[in-house]
């Protein structure tokens, strides 16, 4: 990993995240094959013990250097063996190597974002949007509506490439990714998975590549929620340090509303609802909020327009179901959650 960091620590005018040259290094495929380095990835590399070797990697690299093996003619497509090995094994090795390479700048990007947060200051109660238990432990009495959102899916494989293009400036790697996607053509089945489909697809080959692409796609999809949840988190906390932190936070939010109302009047309504909760589970996400029905509808169409215009992801308003917590319950982690109302009895007495 130290060698990878030295590779990316270049001058600013040279730092373009060129990943394609790394594909021709043998240690990339050694990392993809090593079970020890992948102990934190809950996916097994099936079939690598009998298919990968240093000699096979050298032959693959030599073949890629001398000629382009990705451009297969009609006569070569009928051949099931190449250099004594199955051609599918080459594509599988390249995809696994690309996944290992793609995770390097993606992880460095997350580390840099964490370092920037530490420079700004510690924030104990602005927790991650993926925190399931704070979401379940929070008090929903002050919430009115819940939006059951199905994660939008890309209408074309090129959308997946465009999601990586925003932080990966290597055209050669993007072309290689396009080839791998069209080679297997099972991305659309993975992006909208059911539990049965997901288990059957992940257990097949190239699971590391598709899981990496799915996580990067969802990261782009949740970019708007990262901003909103970091600004308007209202998770329950009891520490005194957090209380002072929340006071300082509401002061900053008040100043932000005043500035935003002057410079950007149309988005003033965006900062009026501090009570927002977001969590993602499998292929859908849940957004709970407090506000009027008109405000919730604005949120709905704002998210749809944001995904379509800025992320080029096709989404329909019907994929966002808005229900009132007082009358409906929402399913999450196999449970149906609802809000129990405590009606107050008012007794009147006539005075003589």
Curated annotation (Swiss-Prot):
What are the protein's UniProt keywords?
Chloroplast, mRNA processing, Plastid, RNA-binding, tRNA processing
Q: Give the range the annotation lists for the signal sequence.
A: none
Q: Name one GO molecular function term.
A: RNA binding
Keyword check for tRNA processing: yes
Query: Superkingdom of the source?
Result: Eukaryota
Q: Which GO terms describe its cellular component?
A: chloroplast
Q: Name one GO biological process term.
A: tRNA processing
Compartments (UniProt record) = Plastid, Chloroplast
Tell whether Transport is among the UniProt keywords. no
Task of the protein? Usually encoded in the trnK tRNA gene intron. Probably assists in splicing its own and other chloroplast group II introns.
Tell me the protein's name: Maturase K
- The organism encoding this protein is Saxifraga oppositifolia (Purple mountain saxifrage)
What gene, per UniProt, encodes this protein? matK
């Amino acid at each position: 990993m130290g060698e990878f960091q030295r590779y990316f620590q270049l001058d600013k005018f040279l730092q373009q995240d060129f990943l394609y040259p790394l594909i021709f290094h043998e240690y990339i495929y050694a990392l993809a094959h090593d079970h020890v380095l992948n102990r934190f990835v809950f996916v097994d590399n099936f079939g690598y013990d009998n298919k990968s070797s240093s000699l096979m990697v050298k032959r693959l690299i030599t073949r890629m250097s001398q000629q382009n093996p990705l451009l297969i003619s009609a006569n070569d497509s009928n051949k099931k063996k190449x250099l004594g090995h199955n051609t599918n094994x080459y594509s599988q090795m390249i995809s696994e190597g690309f996944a290992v390479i793609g995770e390097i700048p993606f992880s460095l990007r997350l580390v840099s974002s964490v370092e920037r947060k530490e420079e700004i200051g510690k924030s104990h109660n602005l927790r991650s949007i993926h925190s399931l238990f704070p979401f379940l432990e929070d008090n929903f009495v002050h919430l009115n509506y819940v939006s059951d959102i199905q994660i939008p899916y890309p209408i074309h494989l090129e959308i997946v490439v465009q999601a990586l293009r925003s932080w990966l400036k290597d055209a050669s790697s993007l072309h290689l990714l396009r080839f791998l996607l069209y080679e297997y053509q099972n991305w659309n089945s993975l992006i909208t998975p059911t539990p049965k489909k997901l288990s059957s697809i992940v257990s097949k080959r190239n699971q590391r590549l598709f899981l990496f692409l799915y996580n990067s796609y969802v990261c782009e999809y949740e970019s708007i929620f990262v901003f909103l949840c970091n600004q308007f988190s209202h998770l329950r906390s009891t520490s005194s340090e957090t209380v002072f932190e929340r006071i300082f936070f509401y002061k900053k939010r008040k100043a932000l509303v005043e500035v935003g109302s002057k410079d950007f009047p149309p988005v003033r309504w965006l900062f009026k609802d501090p009570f927002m909760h977001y969590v993602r589970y499998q292929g859908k996400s849940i957004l709970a909020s407090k506000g009027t029905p008109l405000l919730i509808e604005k949120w709905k169409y704002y998210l749809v327009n944001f995904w379509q215009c800025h992320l080029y992801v096709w989404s329909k308003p019907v994929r966002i179901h808005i229900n009132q917590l007082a009358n409906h319950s929402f399913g999450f982690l196999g449970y149906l959650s609802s809000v129990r109302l405590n009606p107050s009895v008012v007794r009147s007495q006539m005075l003589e």
